[in-house]
Amino acid sequence: MESSASCLPGFFMSFLLLQNTVLTQAMRSDIKINIQVPDTEGLLLECTSGSLIPPAEMTWRDSNGNIIPHSTAFNSQDRDGLLYLKSSILLKNRAKGPITCSIYNVTTNQEKKRSIVLPDALFKSENMSLMSNKFSCPSIYLITIIFLNFLRGILVFCCLRRKPVCFRNLMSTVMEALYSKMGVCCLLIWECLLLVLYIAFLPIYVSFRSRAFLLDDTYPLYTNWLWNICIILTVIMVLFPGLILCLLWTLNCYGQVSSLPPTSMELSTKDSEQNSSKSDDSQENYDVNCKILETCESKIFSQHQESCEDDTASTLFIS
């Protein structure tokens, strides 16, 4: 009797420990609530929980305790016989107070809850468009930047991989054709497009960030600081390339102006040298002609003098 009586407390302790283990095992899994925005018509709340001992049921309740009918429900069991529950509800109007997802286990008569408070700002159309799964402007922006960088990488790879001379000739031909048709604007767009996209990232980010809702008292301060940083960076990134372009343009114009006087002086010196050489040649020709004329005159004079002497001699001989 004494030995059997001494075993009863241990038996009851083991039974209570096992019962507590079963109760804990039945509700050991956490409840997770996710918020999704399939479109701009409402919010989709999704509640999931797993590793539950069947049977168990999942219900949604509002702040007044009223049951909210679920839009979709799903349950499954794994190999160990544990239950996995998933259900969702679609809220199109603003909810006052918390929304509760509860799981009730029939076997253990135990209930576990998880609540979520939805701010009114989440039901605004502009905030829904930020959280929706639709193709948004930031996605288009990022895809454009990735595509342009990918295109530039392909061009550089082709230039370094195969026949760089032919590729450079082709690119120079294309750039000359574009320059002849569209002028300097095309070159500026080609060179500055990525820079403009990088500069435009900050205003786009801030505009979307300001439309988001944060449960933080310092959010306005953070937004103002971010706007100031955005303005400063934008001014710097626009001002310095503008100054560099103006400096290059000024140096180019100054170089062209400074190159004009030496060119005119060289032309004048060349002309004077040519004129002097021509005058020297003409003077030499004149001297040669003068010498030729003098020799001819002297010859003619000598011949005439000889003929006169012959005539005089013949006259005297006849007489």
UniProtKB/Swiss-Prot annotation:
Glycans are attached at N105. Belongs to the SKINT family. May act by engaging a cell surface molecule on immature T-cells in the embryonic thymus. Pfam families: C2-set_3 (PF22705). Expressed in skin, thymus and testis. The chain crosses the membrane at residues 140-160, 184-204, 229-249. It comes from the Eukaryota. Coiled coil: none annotated. This is Selection and upkeep of intraepithelial T-cells protein 9. Residues 1-26 form the signal peptide. It is a multi-pass membrane protein. Residues 161-183, 250-319 are cytoplasmic. InterPro entries: BTN3A2-like_Ig-C, Ig-like_dom, Ig-like_dom_sf, Ig-like_fold, IgSF_BTN/MOG. Residues 27-117 form the Ig-like V-type domain. Gene3D superfamilies: Immunoglobulins. Residues 27-139, 205-228 are extracellular. Disulfide bonds join C47-C101. GO terms for cellular component: membrane.
